[in-house]
């Protein structure tokens, strides 16, 4: 250009000629895309008949309106067989045209109507002017949606909106079927354009996420008003006027997952227990495993559950409650022994090599650059001093620097919930999270340069413009969360440690937050392992409910395979309620009592078996001790269960046949537990073999007393219990009489059912 401008001829061309006309014409006429829509609109509306309509409109709209203005022209639109129409026709149509039913609008535009309600009932507080530390996070921008995948939603939409279109649609998941049925009913005779309905359904069915700068709440009801609540230098307080199910699902899922991981950690086989609990838990009436498959929430406990189910999860790893994502560099791992300030030897896996990470936590974020056992630079930003300190501690421990290890005072012996020692890195973390004073004092400080937006931080966590902890700076700007939604295949071991394909540990139960929250949706844990979540009373009630629900099978096992019954995991939680010193004695006593019931005529007592069964599950001690009552620890003290008779803990009402445990209903016994008949039947039927249901060929039913007249090997129908009739045969030998009563109970039931 400089060359051209220096020569007079070209200079004249460049400065005097109008810009190339062809280029402009090309620009505005090529392609279907309108290049200047506003201008085009103004220019079109200035014409008399800017709109075209189907010919049928001539029969539906008069040629002139009340003011005598022409509404449409008789001339055809050039190049089509449509009519030219004036904007006045639209006004006429709106005022005088046919009305249509509005019943479907709230149903189709449900998400909009609900948003209006939320805003109407929301409260907007004062506006504050302050620096906003925003970090980009992946957030849900679409309140009130189900969690279907794009493909699942597509199938539902096609089925609802275009049911007659060709194309294979497979509706498999429970949620797909429910939604399809519901929507088909709602949208019968709907006159709204199908395409519009399809768009709106998509909003309702699919989670839409965006990577947005956020300073406050990240649930979808806050994100929908993001433009009203936070600017570059201001924020406006806001309380949403309603909750939406998708936020509730996310929140409840996290709570359920945390509870399950915490519980699984302390069981004999954590992985098997975790899977059993995930499969038997429901959140808001939907199976937890279905939610896990569809819900993209990333949280440590949720990701452990996903990994256990073989689902892919994010490749970032977790340490000290921060999500670490390596942004550059690489390292190899090597075992190394180090000495703490207390001369305790720790075996740590050292990362050798230069690496850079982003660290993102709930209240603080950071950029970390490190080399082998050396922190090079840490830039932190956070909501307050406390949050910034948390991030600094985690980064210092993660750096594995020698001065950090030497700052340990006292012994490291932290254990997890299952009383197992934590690994060395978590030992160090816990130690300094408790008290980081020595760590910060020993770290060292350095003078700092004045850099815009950065200040120093001293060992007592106060800001400074002159000095700072070595390598550490505080920044006004947050560090964005990792934006990629990439998911990787991972493996999980039986102690719930999750590793990527290279063997790096991404997650472990130590990383699961101990924060307790109250779930928004009802979480139903059907697994006996979760009975204790609501305390001792819940364990008591659930144990007895389980026995009553499964009484049919329990009864058979009680008489034929008691050991297997005593070992059932459903009795495990109950043991924690029995005073430690008494467990073995109680168990021995109850087992002996049960054996006598099996051996002695007429002592079979259903209610007593149900009541004492959980006590027999502990390893028994052989002792001659007798008890008239057994103690359980509930409501903060020992309460007694009477061996014979009712008590506030265990109360069976003969009249209603219902059991109440601690005043809570525990269910009804379907059979008649009247001790007499049950015992008498099994007793009287000793010496007889029960063959099956009544057989008319052997004559009318005899009463139990008439049985004694039968000869050995003779068969007869006999009336037992509540008017049931079974076919029996008198045994040919007497030797096997003892085992009869054990099988009698079972056979009677099989014959009757």
Swiss-Prot record:
Keywords: Cap snatching, Eukaryotic host gene expression shutoff by virus, Eukaryotic host transcription shutoff by virus, Host gene expression shutoff by virus, Host nucleus, Host-virus interaction, Inhibition of host RNA polymerase II by virus, mRNA capping, mRNA processing, Viral transcription, Virion
Subcellular location: Virion; Host nucleus
Motif (Nuclear localization signal): 730-733
Marked site positions, Avian adaptation: 621
Protein name as it appears in the record: Polymerase basic protein 2
Functional note: Plays an essential role in transcription initiation and cap-stealing mechanism, in which cellular capped pre-mRNAs are used to generate primers for viral transcription. Recognizes and binds the 7-methylguanosine-containing cap of the target pre-RNA which is subsequently cleaved after 10-13 nucleotides by the viral protein PA. Plays a role in the initiation of the viral genome replication and modulates the activity of the ribonucleoprotein (RNP) complex.
One Gene Ontology cellular component: host cell nucleus
Gene Ontology MF terms in the entry: RNA binding
Species the sequence originates in: Influenza A virus (strain A/Chicken/Hong Kong/31.2/2002 H5N1 genotype X1)
InterPro entries xref list: Flu_PB2_2nd (IPR049110), Flu_PB2_6th (IPR049114), Flu_PB2_C (IPR049115), Flu_PB2_CAP-bd (IPR048298), Flu_PB2_middle (IPR049111), Flu_PB2_N (IPR049106), INV_PB2 (IPR001591), PB2_helical (IPR049113)
One GO biological process term: viral RNA genome replication
């Amino acid at each position: 250009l400089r060359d051209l401008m220096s020569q007079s001829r070209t200079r004249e061309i460049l400065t005097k000629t109008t810009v190339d006309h062809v280029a402009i014409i090309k620009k505005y006429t090529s392609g279907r895309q309108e290049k200047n829509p506003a201008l085009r609109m103004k220019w079109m509306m200035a014409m008399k008949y800017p709109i075209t309509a189907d010919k049928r409109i001539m029969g539906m709209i008069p040629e002139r309106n009340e003011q005598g203005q022409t509404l449409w022209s008789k001339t055809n639109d050039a190049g089509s067989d449509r009519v030219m129409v004036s904007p006045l026709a639209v006004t006429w149509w709106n005022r005088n045209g046919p009305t249509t039913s509005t019943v479907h609008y709230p149903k189709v535009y449900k998400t909009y109507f609900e948003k209006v309600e939320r805003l109407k009932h929301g409260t907007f507080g004062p506006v504050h002017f302050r620096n906003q530390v925003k970090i980009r996070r992946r957030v849900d921008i679409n309140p009130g949606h189900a969690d279907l995948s794009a493909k699942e939603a597509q199938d539902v939409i096609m089925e609802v909106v275009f049911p007659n279109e060709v194309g294979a649609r497979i509706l498999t998941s429970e949620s797909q079927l429910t939604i399809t049925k519901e929507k088909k009913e709602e949208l019968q005779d709907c006159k709204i354009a199908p395409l519009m309905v399809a768009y709106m359904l998509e909003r309702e069915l699919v989670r839409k996420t965006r990577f947005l700068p956020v300073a406050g709440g990240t649930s979808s009801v806050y994100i929908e008003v993001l433009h009203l609540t936070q600017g570059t230098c201001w924020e406006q307080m806001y309380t949403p006027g309603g909750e939406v199910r998708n936020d509730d699902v996310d929140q409840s899922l996290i709570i359920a997952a945390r509870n399950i991981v915490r519980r699984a950690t302390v069981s004999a086989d954590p992985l098997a227990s975790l899977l059993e609990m995930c499969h038997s838990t429901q959140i808001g009436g939907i199976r937890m495993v279905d939610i896990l498959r569809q819900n993209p929430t990333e949280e440590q406990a949720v990701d452990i559950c996903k990994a256990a189910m073989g689902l892919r999860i994010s490749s970032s790893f977790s340490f000290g409650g921060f999500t670490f994502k390596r942004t550059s560099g690489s390292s190899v791992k090597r075992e190394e022994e180090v000495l703490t300030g207390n001369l305790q030897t720790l075996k740590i896996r050292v990362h050798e090599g230069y690496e850079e990470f982003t660290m993102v936590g709930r209240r603080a974020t950071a950029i970390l650059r490190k080399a082998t056992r050396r922190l090079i630079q840490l830039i932190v930003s956070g909501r307050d001093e406390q949050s910034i300190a948390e991030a600094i501690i985690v980064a210092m421990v993660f750096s594995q620097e020698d001065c950090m290890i030497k700052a340990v005072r006292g012994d490291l012996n932290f254990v997890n919930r299952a009383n197992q020692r934590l690994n060395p890195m978590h030992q160090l973390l816990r130690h300094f999270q408790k008290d980081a004073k020595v760590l910060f004092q020993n770290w060292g400080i350095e003078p700092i340069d004045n850099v815009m937006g950065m200040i120093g931080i001293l060992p007592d966590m106060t800001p400074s413009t002159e000095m700072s902890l070595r390598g550490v700076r505080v920044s006004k700007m947050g560090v964005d969360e990792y934006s990629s939604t990439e998911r990787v295949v991972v493996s999980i071991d039986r102690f719930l440690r999750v590793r990527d394909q290279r063997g790096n540990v991404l997650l472990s139960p130590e990383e699961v937050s101990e924060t307790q929250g109250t779930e928004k949706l009802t979480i139903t844990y059907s697994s006996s392992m979760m009975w204790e979540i609501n305390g001792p009373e819940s364990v008591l009630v659930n144990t007895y409910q389980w026995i009553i629900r499964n009484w049919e099978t329990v009864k058979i096992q009680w008489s034929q395979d008691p050991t297997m019954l005593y070992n059932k995991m459903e009795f495990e939680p109950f043991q924690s309620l029995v005073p430690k010193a008494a467990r073995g004695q109680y168990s021995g006593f109850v087992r002996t009592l049960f054996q006598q019931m099996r051996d002695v005529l007429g002592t079979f007592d259903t209610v007593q078996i149900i009541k004492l069964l959980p006590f027999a599950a502990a390893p028994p001690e052989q002792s001659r001790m007798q008890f008239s009552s057994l103690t359980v620890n509930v409501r903060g003290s020992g309460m007694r269960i009477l061996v014979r008779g009712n008590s506030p803990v265990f109360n069976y009402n003969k009249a209603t046949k219902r059991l109440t445990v601690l005043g809570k209903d525990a269910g009804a016994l379907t059979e008649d537990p009247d001790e007499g008949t049950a015992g008498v039947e099994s007793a009287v039927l000793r010496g007889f073999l029960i063959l099956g249901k009544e057989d008319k060929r052997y004559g009318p039913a005899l009463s139990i007393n008439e049985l004694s007249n039968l000869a050995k090997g003779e068969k007869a129908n006999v009336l037992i219990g509540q008017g049931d009739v079974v076919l029996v045969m008198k045994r040919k030998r007497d030797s096997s009489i003892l085992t009869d009563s054990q099988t009698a109970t079972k056979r009677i039931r099989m014959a009757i059912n």
